[in-house]
């Protein structure tokens, strides 16, 4: 049966990737359909109740700068906000927030239900309609056919999902939800490389059964940071603490004595789990020298007693889970509300994607989220937004767009996935970015909002506020450049108290702000440089841009230099064994990958900057560099 109306874009799945994909497509004016197996689970946090963190917070800020929802939703649902790495440089500072699951999900659903150009429909998808290597629609579980110019699959852990608790396993997309078997089988018929991954979740605990008096409280920041560019502290709900406990030798003995009942160690689970979020049994075995592991006790919300013990993800049998939990300080009488479990699922090699998230084999078909081998809400949201945007552009017959590695962590994400692929669940870290001084949380809007406006993702209110901030920054920098003090100026005594050595010659406000011992707040408390900007976002940018000016310029020069060789062609018949100085490992990797350009070669795992320099010397020596590429 054919549905009575057609769509420009269909998004399959209503998780963090699917919601951003659907909203991005709808925001650009395309008639969009979001299909989900259950409308009540839209925006659900299937694992930990938190948004952000190192690298991840950067992605959330970028999604926000592109008009996405995640930052706005967590600002309305966050029950504890913190800035991580606050004492370090701005490049690695990151925002993280605990979420009230119910508030977060309700905010997301409300945004979806009220979005213009977006239709919701509750049905699982069993099949794709493909016409000569071009997707033209989908078929739902009840045989209903929907037609569209582009389809975005954001199916999370549902493709062939299998849940494990001890040696018992069952089919499922997550606890309480059925898997997507028919669609998984259909996708396996297409020319994609497919494999299995695994993730897991800890048991949930009833807070009323925990002795908090013996736990260490962990409070949020005051004042609280805000995620969204348009966010306000008054949007945030009541703030509450998290708590910390630890595993101990008793915990570890329980785990070691029951490894034969672990599906992971018994070989029942084939999928590879996330390296940076291992199960507790994996941690105990991999770090055998450690006597304890820190466990963060995270509230699931303001109106529930459920706790999320971050750090004891497990697939051990339920009776062992009870022993593990009750071995920890404060949890001697703990009651488990929901058992922990592991889940295996299909993912598709992201090297079969273009940089727009469109698949190389099926035109108009886009993948986003865990289907691409990633882990994490933030990584999913970033992919979803970009896939939804590019599906919209495809449906309009326009060229796709993706940021470069030097423009956004979103660019690092798709570039890593599409050039290197992944064998384990991929998560974002600031260390993955070569130009992280330029890719800060605080300047996500400056990097991306103008382009997002051009692409139709930014509304008038945000655009006006963005331009106001730019104007405030430019005016303030000009004021500081043109305001001077000398050793005889009024107020010099107050200034000298701030300086390591007394002022010896005339200096502008900008000169003084470059000094590490003087902050913008210090400077603008002096009469000569008062008043401070009321726009705190603008004043923060002024301070960072002035203090890091030299480093920023140096990194921009590095980018310009690297871009000169980004598209330098590598001959298809180049025999890498003839390139003197390359290691056998590098020769083998380049021979297998056959990269088309220096830029692609540079991003193959294991190809070092030194190897790229050797390649450039070889190309120059044999006259294979074009004019302008030889520097």
Curated annotation (Swiss-Prot):
Q: Where in the cell is it found?
A: Cytoplasm
Whether Nucleotide-binding counts among this entry's keywords is no
Q: Which cofactors, by name?
A: FAD
Q: Which UniProt keywords apply?
A: Cytoplasm, FAD, Flavoprotein, NAD, tRNA processing
Q: Does the keyword field hold DNA-binding?
A: no
Ligand binding (NAD(+)): 273-287
Q: Which InterPro entries match?
A: FAD/NAD-bd_sf, GIDA_C_N, MnmG, MnmG-rel, MnmG-rel_CS, MnmG_C, MnmG_C_subdom, MnmG_C_subdom_sf
Q: Which GO terms describe its molecular function?
A: flavin adenine dinucleotide binding
Which residues are FAD-binding? 13-18, 125, 180, 370
Alphabetized PROSITE patterns for the sequence: GIDA_1 (PS01280), GIDA_2 (PS01281)
Gene Ontology, cellular component aspect: cytosol
GO terms under biological process: tRNA methylation; tRNA wobble uridine modification
NCBIfam families named among the record's database cross-references: mnmG_gidA
Q: Subunit structure of this entry? A: Homodimer. Heterotetramer of two MnmE and two MnmG subunits.
Query: Briefly, what is this protein's role?
Result: NAD-binding protein involved in the addition of a carboxymethylaminomethyl (cmnm) group at the wobble position (U34) of certain tRNAs, forming tRNA-cmnm(5)s(2)U34.
Identify its protein family.
Belongs to the MnmG family.
What name is this protein filed under?
tRNA uridine 5-carboxymethylaminomethyl modification enzyme MnmG
Species = Vibrio campbellii (strain ATCC BAA-1116)
